[in-house]
Each structure stands twice: as C-alpha cells, then as structure tokens.
Swiss-Prot record:
Modified residues (N6-acetyllysine): K16
Organism, as annotated: Panthera tigris sumatrae (Sumatran tiger)
Residue numbers bearing the Phosphotyrosine modification: Y24
Lineage: Eukaryota, Metazoa, Chordata, Craniata, Vertebrata
Purpose: Involved in oxygen transport from the lung to the various peripheral tissues.
Family affiliation: Belongs to the globin family.
InterPro entries found in the cross-reference section: Globin (IPR000971), Globin-like_sf (IPR009050), Globin/Proto (IPR012292), Hemoglobin_a-typ (IPR002338), Hemoglobin_oxygen_transport (IPR050056)
Name of the molecule in the record: Hemoglobin subunit alpha
Residue sites binding O2 per the record: H58
Amino acid sequence: VLSSADKNNVKACWGKIGSHAGEYGAEALERTFCSFPTTKTYFPHFDLSHGSAQVQTHGQKVADALTKAVAHINNLPNALSDLSDLHAYKLRVDPVNFKFLSHCLLVTLACHHPEEFTPAVHASLDKFFSAVSTVLTSKYR
C-alpha cells in the first residue's frame, strides 16, 4: 500500500523526469531485453537493436502509461483497466516480466537522477511499480 509519503515521492520524482520519460522508458526496455532475454519473445516483430525506432516508440508507450498511473495514483485499477485487459487477454504477457521491467526502470532512474534517488524515493518507486504490476496482472486470475 502506498503511503502519502510514497505518493508524494513518486509524484515529485516523476515530475523531475519530465520530457525524458519516453527516453527512460526505452532505455529501461533495452535493459530488460539485455538482462532478461526471454522478454524478447513478446516482440518478435521488433528491431530490438540499441536505439531502434520500435523500442523508442514502445518506451514512450510505457512512459505514457506510467505518467497516467502517476496522475491517477489514488485509483490505479480504474486508470489502468484497459492496459490490464490488453496484457492479460490479448498479449498474454507472463506477469514476471512486469517485475523485470520495474527493476530496469529503477536502475534507469537511479542512473539518470542519482541525487534524487534516495533510499526513500527508491522504496516509494519500487512500491509504486509493484502496485502498477499488480493492477496489470489482476485480470489474469
């Protein structure tokens, strides 16, 4: 459960990301594909090379979804319902992949914002990404 401090930390951190959200989303995807090669199986039609336009575009989609989640942090299930349906019923993504991407998002954000990435912010973002992952996998049951 996200506390008020967690929500404030997430909103403050995401606010500092600003226009770099898509770039960081793509970087996190690249990290995920490199660190967890089985995740590539969901993107057989993508050019997964460094800096590819397809990875950049999908990274922006990830960032947009997270930006929406931050904006609706008090009602994640409603805000992410369509995305949950897509991943559960159409794409059938293995739920563990959300944990992999979450980890890579944390690494990416820590690399780009080391001063702001305090232990408290790290914990808050980890809880937030976990909450988002839980919502995205909630319709698998």
